[in-house]
């Protein structure tokens, strides 16, 4: 995987419109809140101008003619409607913070809001109540025209969108994930199935007890994909993990609805918000 070393900003006042027209077929989608956590990590305040310079620098590095800022605004209303405990663990953790930690987090979010205001003068910012950036990115990947798309996020969930035309850059690892540098032992097509079987502890999504990465990949290889596996349940076997799997058809179907960004992004964003996105982006 290629490493990116230079994340310096462009000179002050340089506008995105001045970039070469020859690069206009490259789309860059920025996971806005995710990218801002670099400043929280270093305890940096008043980072709005630095944030803008960082986005401009990334756009220059990837010769992006189109840049779109995708931003969370609360947890997904769609996911909570089908699974009320979605991300409940994060809420519980927040409630145990000290007063000092809460004040620091609130200060960070104030700075982040200011950064969004600054960056909005240069690029379209897509942000809607109860909609997550993952779903906005999935919709853009499916509906925008581009020669190649770069996703700027350290969130591995975005790897569900990787294809010949879509790649990801992580500012945390400073590495690129592409179809040619696919880092997982499963195939790209079975990455969703792997996630469904294992769950996602960060989002409070449970997997099948006793099924780790190796068993999950073996199952997906044997039955082609997660949908085919669900269709044939129950499968023969006396092992405990097989019994758990056979009892988990409903769980796996729920996990698909929670994790399949490509299939359910329209549901997660909502008709009115999609209409607004189309108007803003003229697509």
Outline where the language-model segments fall.
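Domain-level signal for Mg2+-assisted phosphodiester chemistry and nucleotide/NA-binding surfaces
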Residues: 2-115
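Disordered, low-complexity tails and leader-like regions
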Residues: 1, 281-282
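Extended two-metal-dependent nuclease catalytic cores across DNA- and RNA-processing enzymes
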Residues: 2-13, 91-271
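Charged, low-complexity intrinsically disordered segments
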Residues: 247, 274-281
């Amino acid at each position: 995987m290629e490493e990116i070393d230079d994340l310096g900003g462009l000179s002050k006042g340089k506008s995105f419109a001045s970039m070469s027209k020859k690069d206009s077929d490259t789309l860059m989608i920025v996971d806005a809140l995710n990218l801002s956590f670099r400043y929280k990590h270093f305890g940096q305040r008043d980072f709005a101008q630095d944030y803008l310079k960082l986005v401009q620098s990334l756009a220059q590095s990837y010769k992006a003619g189109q840049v779109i800022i995708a931003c969370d605004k609360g947890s997904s209303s769609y996911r909570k409607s089908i699974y009320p405990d979605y991300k409940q663990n994060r809420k519980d953790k927040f409630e145990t913070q000290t007063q000092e930690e809460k004040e620091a987090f609130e200060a960070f979010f104030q700075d982040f809001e200011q950064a969004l205001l600054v960056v909005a003068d240069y690029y379209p910012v897509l942000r809607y109540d109860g909609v997550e950036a993952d779903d906005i990115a999935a919709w853009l990947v499916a509906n925008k025209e581009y020669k190649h798309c770069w996703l700027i996020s350290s969130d591995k969930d975005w790897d569900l969108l990787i294809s010949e035309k879509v790649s990801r850059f992580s500012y945390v690892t400073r590495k690129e994930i592409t179809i040619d540098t696919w880092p997982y032992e499963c195939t790209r097509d079975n990455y969703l199935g792997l996630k469904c079987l294992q769950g996602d502890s960060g989002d409070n999504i449970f997997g099948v007890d006793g099924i780790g990465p190796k068993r999950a990949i073996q199952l997906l290889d044997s039955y082609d994909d997660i949908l085919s596996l669900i269709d044939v349940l129950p499968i023969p076997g006396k092992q405990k993990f097989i019994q758990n799997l056979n009892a988990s058809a409903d769980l796996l179907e729920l996990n698909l609805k929670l994790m399949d960004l490509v299939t359910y992004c329209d549901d997660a964003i909502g008709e009115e918000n999609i209409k607004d996105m189309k108007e803003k982006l003229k697509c």
